[in-house]
Amino acid sequence: MCGLVFMGSKNIGYRDVEVFEEMLFCDTLRGSHSTGVCGIFEDKEHGTRNKLVKAAVPGPEFIASGFLDEAISIRTKNGNVTTIKRPIAAFGHNRYATKGEVNAVNAHPFTHDHITLAHNGTLTGQHRLIDHKKFEVDSENIAYSISKVGFVETLKNLDGAFTLIWHDSNLNTVNTIRNKERPFYLVRTSTNDWFGASEKEMLLWIMGRQKSPITIAEQFECEPGVQYVFDVTNGVFSFKEKVKHELPTFTRFPYSSSYSNFYGDDDYDYWTVS
């Protein structure tokens, strides 16, 4: 079990950063083996660029060590004045390792060419993805596949549980999609700030405990098979569209099962027909 957190806004301020930090901290309950954050910044030459920081430490240590601040700030110094530039969007991942060793290399997110991606879930049929033997971690294989053959072709071969968040620097978009085996919730505020997390109760609790009140305009669980697309062209964050996809189906024969837990998203073992 892993966890994902997300924020995006036309003007990310202190309160947004505080909410994101607290989400990343609490999301450690879903995975304490490693933590990673991708900050997406305006770039005058390319529209956007991202800054990726990850480490094999739990969320609280990631924050205390300054890794989070490194991922979501660009500092420039002019004499005695230091200017801090904030991202227009960011997503974070708290990993509980199911495939691959616990180290910074295997921490999420993963970058391949123009795709930077984080994944909650486990693929039972990684062999369906291109060049699968090259990758110890199935999640990195997903990022690689999207960078090579695109998201639509990759989706056809996603055999297993997933929620994905990824930044496409070619299209200048941030995207999320899930299947029914993994959760993800989004909240839009009255000022059109967006937040997301794997756990609804955690997300709403953190937003509700802020000193400066946050008014929620809408909240919802992402619909399975729907790609939520956020535009970050020219460094301006906005919701763009929802794209409905047909999720692939595979024949599976369960031969053992994990215990059920409160979250209802354990990993299971299957014989999968190729």
Task: Enumerate the predicted regions with their spans.
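Conserved short alpha-helical segments that host acidic/polar catalytic motifs at enzyme active sites
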Residues: 1-274
